[in-house]
């Protein structure tokens, strides 16, 4: 007996027009801001962008230009956009490298290690995930200042190398691995680290891809934390750098829009690269759950 929730053979869709219109409206609501952002980034006049905002003219450009994208690289010596972009890439790569390693190691130990109080630790992690990050910003900032790590890459990377959410996601995947696979590796003389590195990680690519996407987007979009821990352009990421286009006397809408498009592009590329694994992981988790 089929368990497919879609339309079964012999049945017809009773409301095809309603479904089509609903999907079209939802898609339009989602895509419209992105389209508006791209169109505004192609307009040469920042005053035109502000004047047309809120009207249908905002979704059309008569004389498109890529000059805005060139201008953000040479906007001002006080706003080195190219440096901000490089900083964001460095922070992203360091965070992904450490986050994927430490979160997966912790998940493996919780799933297969002989750890006393494992249930209590899992409960504590879920509780910590519920706590808003904003509530621990000031204590964490104080720790970074006392360690002398503020205004650098370390302060923007180290706090995100461990996350209750990602440990729990990977724990769920690791705990579903058949016991026979683990026992076979033990019989072959593999150490716990070798089992983790050579057996579990290769078969966990869908789950790791999911964590990489979520962690990458979270890191790339960080604003409050880097705003608090950075004082110089040397380590400031692109999310904070864009705020420099909004001055007290004037707002460079054209440059801000172009910079926002540049900031948005890597997130889309990251998802497209890992899209297959991400979808497979979600489906697999749903079936196992």
Residue ranges and their predicted role:
Residues 7-11, 15-289:
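A structural signal for multi-pass alpha-helical bundles of membrane permease subunits
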Residues 1-5:
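Short, intrinsically disordered terminal tails adjacent to the first/last structured region
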């Amino acid at each position: 007996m089929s368990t497919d929730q879609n339309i079964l053979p012999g049945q017809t869709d009773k409301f095809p027009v309603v479904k089509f219109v609903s999907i079209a409206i939802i898609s339009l609501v989602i895509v419209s801001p992105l389209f508006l952002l791209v169109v505004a980034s192609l307009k040469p006049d920042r005053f035109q962008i502000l004047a047309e905002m809120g009207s249908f003219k905002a979704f059309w450009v008569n004389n498109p230009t890529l000059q805005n994208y060139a201008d953000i690289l040479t906007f001002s010596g006080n706003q080195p956009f190219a440096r901000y972009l490089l900083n964001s890439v460095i922070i992203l790569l360091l965070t992904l490298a450490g986050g994927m390693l430490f979160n997966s190691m912790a998940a493996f130990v919780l799933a297969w290690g002989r750890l006393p109080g494992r249930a209590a630790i899992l409960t504590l992690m879920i509780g910590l995930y519920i706590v808003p990050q904003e509530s621990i910003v000031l204590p964490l900032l104080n720790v970074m200042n006392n360690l002398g790590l503020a205004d650098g890459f370390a302060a923007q990377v180290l706090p995100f190398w461990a996350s209750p959410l990602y440990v729990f996601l990977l724990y769920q995947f690791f705990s579903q691995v058949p016991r026979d696979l683990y026992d076979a590796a033990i019989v072959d003389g593999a150490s716990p680290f070798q089992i983790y590195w050579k057996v579990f990680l290769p078969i966990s690519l869908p789950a790791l891809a999911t964590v990489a996407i979520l962690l990458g987007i979270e890191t790339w979009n960080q604003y409050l934390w880097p705003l608090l821990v950075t004082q110089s352009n040397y380590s400031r990421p692109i999310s904070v750098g864009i705020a420099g286009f909004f001055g007290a006397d004037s707002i460079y809408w054209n440059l801000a829009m172009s910079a926002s498009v540049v900031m948005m592009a890597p997130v889309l590329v990251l998802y497209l690269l890992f899209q297959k694994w991400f979808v497979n992981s979600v489906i697999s988790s749903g079936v196992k759950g």
